[in-house]
Swiss-Prot record:
It is found in: Cytoplasm. InterPro entries: aa-tRNA-synth_II/BPL/LPL, B3/B4_tRNA-bd, DNA-bd_dom_put_sf, Fdx_antiC-bd, Fdx_antiC-bd_sf, NA-bd_OB-fold, Phe-tRNA-ligase_IIc_bsu, Phe-tRNA-ligase_IIc_bsu_bact. It is an enzyme of class 6 (ligase). Binds 2 magnesium ions per tetramer. CDD domains: PheRS_beta_core (cd00769), tRNA_bind_bactPheRS (cd02796). The gene is pheT. This is Phenylalanine--tRNA ligase beta subunit.
Length: 807
């Protein structure tokens, strides 16, 4: 929407500069795209009158004129002097008021007018066209001014060219601002000024001629007004003031009738259309187009109308596409003397998208698609009638109206709560100011309650299609109050450190440990294949889904192994030889004593197969074994700072190899298990090579022992190695625990570094090589101190485990 600042100031005149006004409009949500002068920079151009006009003696296309400038005088023109100017414009004629650039004048582009001689005749200036002073891009001849234009007056002052155009890029919801009326209302509200609207009075009919109006599509056209105007002067011209206002809004002057309808569109934001009365057959009918009905538009293009297109028709034919484009056959021409003037409300949904179906986009369709004021039709037709009668003359008949009250948009009731307003804006605006803003916007406002319980009951006018709910009113109050006037307040919150128990071990630590050990995380479904699960957990009760995705995903998993092993098969089938996967998630174990009859436990599980490390020329190939995966599990348990508290013991698990399986406990509580998959299961599942697997309860490994700080001794440590011979069925773990128990405070580290069976060791026995590190924080240990500890350890091992020192 482009408009002239001076035209806007006729309605409302805030004490703001052009730039400040544009900024204010932008900050109110109506973005200004540009502010441009309405004419080029020029000086020394005044109004003159052609008092003599004759042919050039040596040029057929030139004329020699004498121009009167009235009482104007300058350094190059004396008062009352007739200025000789040679002109080539075809429309130059005797008595014409023109724009004269005298010698010394400067035109746009820094073009200076000098005395010249054209084909032997001196010329002391130039008669200017609109394009030469920057009023138009091109022109057919010199500029013709009104007959009452005062001689000698500066053209810039006469045409009020010290003006700018402001181009506003309106969003689709602000159709109410597609006219000076709506824009002025906004500026008035922003500056707390009254808006001076032009006085519109009903034009009394002087003839009785009417045309009947019938509306078949009431929902699409709830209101249609028409008026006959007869006896207009087809030779009348549009007054310069109107031409200039149209031009500054980006609209070209065509003829007085079209110019008036365009003027109403720009002034009130209401599209109108005029038909040549002589070309209408009978009454007006507002209907939808018939199948394959054709219409030649004003641009002389013929279109085949679609059945959903609303048209204005007479008894025999379609006359226009309603709200979009007029028809050529019924259009106003230079010979038109009688008019039928249309002012209608077309529903936005009836016009929306229709113009684009025909490759069109008009100022009229642009406004109807966004919605116009459904109460403005009478004002529009009366204003247009008044202007037409003053410009082209004629006699007006009575206004004929057809309407469907049930389909005309009604006012809306929306409540605005004080508590919600303050919450959304984050700033308290006084009650009186809120009421004033809403009232100035054209809303009818009543209030109830006080304080935070205050409610504004707002009746929204029908032309504000965008106001539907409470937040729409909040937006209106905020933008009119001014977003810049809302103080910047940093968010305030009561900050409290989240309690983080030092004993809590994060799951991410466990995951990262496995990733560091070359595992990759997998995510599998919680519902699994019942056949595979039955192989891993034979005889165990499962939860069956009532509506499974498929039969292969019909039960809930009893462990994470089912999904991981199927992922292992999937990857091995794609030539992946070395695979290391882990997963965390829930398992679902039926348990009548649990909530909802199911015990849901968070688990972490892993599976490995293939080589211990990737192939490399510097390393010997070695397949993974039980101790590889046990080492991975021990790395996880080490994160708890209490790895010694976990016990690995021989166990039997249905899915695992009977001789390569261990269960993990802590203080007698089951933690998990680790081992080699049963060879029979490897065969049934289609796995290649040895597969090793583990699963732990996260609840038992996500609690870590809080370490206790001890002094670092500055005295040397002493290492003593013991080779202990015990029966083969004695666990090394029991040996280490016993040594730790009797080693006393001097024992700071203990390590099993060798296990030997063979020559020199009796059958049924094994040799354990154990390193003991002894140190004191207060002194250097003497040999006697060390010997006492070693003797005590050896004696206890002999007594408790029947162990002996190896020879």
């Amino acid at each position: 929407m482009k408009f002239s600042e001076s035209w806007l100031r006729e309605w409302v005149n805030p004490a703001l500069s052009s730039d400040d006004l544009a900024h204010q409009i932008t900050m109110a949500g109506l973005e200004v795209d540009g502010v441009d002068p309405v004419a080029g920079e020029f000086s020394g151009v005044v109004i003159g009158e052609v008092v003599e006009c004759g042919p050039h003696p040596d040029a057929d296309k030139l004329q020699v004129t004498k121009i009167s400038l009235g009482d104007y005088s300058s350094t190059t023109v004396e008062k009352g002097e007739l200025v000789t100017i040679v002109c080539g414009a075809k429309n130059c004629r005797l008595g014409l008021k023109v724009a004269v650039a005298t010698v010394g004048a400067v035109l746009p582009g820094d073009f200076k007018i000098k005395k010249a001689k054209l084909r032997g005749v001196p010329s002391f200036g130039m008669l200017c066209s609109e394009s030469e002073i920057g009023l138009a891009d091109d022109s057919d001849g010199i500029m013709e001014l009104a007959s009452d234009a005062p001689l000698g007056q500066c053209v810039r002052e006469y045409l009020d060219l010290n003006d700018v155009t402001i181009d506003v890029d309106l969003t689709a919801n602000r159709g109410d601002c597609l006219g000076l009326k709506g824009l002025a209302r906004e500026v008035g509200v922003l500056n707390s000024l009254e808006v001076s609207e032009p006085t519109i009075t009903a034009v009394a009919p002087t003839i009785d001629d009417v045309i009947t109006i019938n509306i078949e599509a009431n929902e699409a056209c709830p209101r249609y007004l028409g008026r006959v105007i007869k006896g207009i002067n087809p030779n009348a011209t549009t007054p310069l003031w109107m031409v200039e206002k149209l031009r500054r809004c980006g609209t070209r002057s065509i003829d007085p009738v079209v110019d008036v309808t365009n003027y109403i569109l720009l002034e009130l934001g209401h599209p109108m259309h005029a038909f040549d009365l002589a070309k209408l057959d009978g009454g007006i009918n507002v209907r939808f187009a018939n199948k394959d009905e054709k219409l030649t538009l004003l641009d002389e293009n013929e279109v085949t109308l679609k059945e959903g297109t609303l048209v204005i028709a007479d008894e025999n034919k379609a006359l226009a596409m309603a709200g979009i484009f007029g028809g050529l056959e019924s259009g106003v021409t230079n010979n038109t003397t009688d008019l039928f003037l249309e002012s209608a409300f077309f529903a936005p949904l009836a016009i929306l998208g229709k113009a684009r179906q025909y490759g069109l986009h008009t100022d009229s369709s642009h406004r109807y698609e966004r919605g116009i004021d459904p109460t403005l039709q009478h004002d529009a037709i009366e204003r247009a009638t008044e202007l037409l009668l003053s410009i082209v003359g004629g006699q007006a008949g009575p206004v004929v109206e057809a309407k469907s009250d049930a389909d005309i948009p009604q006012t809306k009731d929306v409540n605005l709560r004080r508590k919600m307003l303050d919450s959304r804006i984050g700033h308290h605006i006084e009650d009186a100011q809120v009421s004033e803003i809403l009232t100035r916007l054209g809303f009818t406002v009543t209030t109830t309650g006080e304080g935070e319980a205050k409610v504004w009951q707002v009746i929204v006018p029908a032309y504000r299609f965008d106001i539907k709910i409470e937040v729409d009113l909040i937006e209106e109050v905020a933008r009119i109050f001014g977003y810049n006037n809302i103080p910047n307040i940093a968010p305030k919150a009561t900050l409290k450190m989240c309690e983080q128990k030092e004993a809590n071990l994060s799951l991410s630590n466990l995951k990262q440990t496995l990733v560091n050990r070359d595992y990759q995380e997998a995510i599998t479904y919680s519902f699994v294949d019942p056949k595979v699960q039955a192989l891993l957990h034979p005889g165990q009760e499962v939860m069956t889904l009532p509506h499974p995705i498929s039969s292969e995903m019909s039960v809930m998993r009893l462990s994470l192994w089912t999904g991981l092993l199927q992922s292992m098969v999937y990857n091995q089938n794609r030539q992946q030889g070395r695979i290391r996967l882990f997963e965390t998630g829930l398992r679902f174990v039926p348990d009548e004593s649990a909530e909802n009859g199911v015990r849901q436990q968070n688990m972490i599980a892993g599976v490995i197969s293939g080589l211990r490390v990737d192939e490399h020329w510097s390393m010997e190939k070695a397949a993974t074994d039980f101790y590889d995966i046990k080492g991975d599990v021990e790395a996880l348990l080490a994160l708890t700072c209490d790895a010694q508290g976990y016990e690995f013991s021989k166990a039997e698990v249905d899915a695992l190899h009977p001789g390569q399986t261990a269960q993990i406990t802590k203080n007698g509580v089951f933690v998990g298990c680790v081992g080699t998959l049963h060879p029979e299961l490897e065969r049934k599942l289609g796995l290649n090579g040895r597969t090793l697997i583990f699963e732990l309860l996260l609840s038992e490994v996500l609690v870590q022992k809080i370490p206790e700080a001890t002094d670092i001794s500055r005295f040397p440590a002493n290492r003593r190695d013991l080779a202990i011979v015990v029966k083969e069925d004695v666990d090394a773990k029991n040996v280490l625990q016993l040594i730790e128990k009797v080693g006393g405070n001097y024992l700071i580290d203990l390590n099993l570094f060798d296990v030997y069976k063979g020559q020199g060791i009796d059958d049924g026995f094994k040799s354990l090589a154990i390193a003991l590190v002894l140190q004191d924080t207060s002194k250097t240990l003497e040999e006697k101190d060390i010997t006492d500890v070693i003797d005590r350890v050896v004696a206890t091992l002999k007594t408790e485990l029947n162990a002996s020192l190896r020879d």
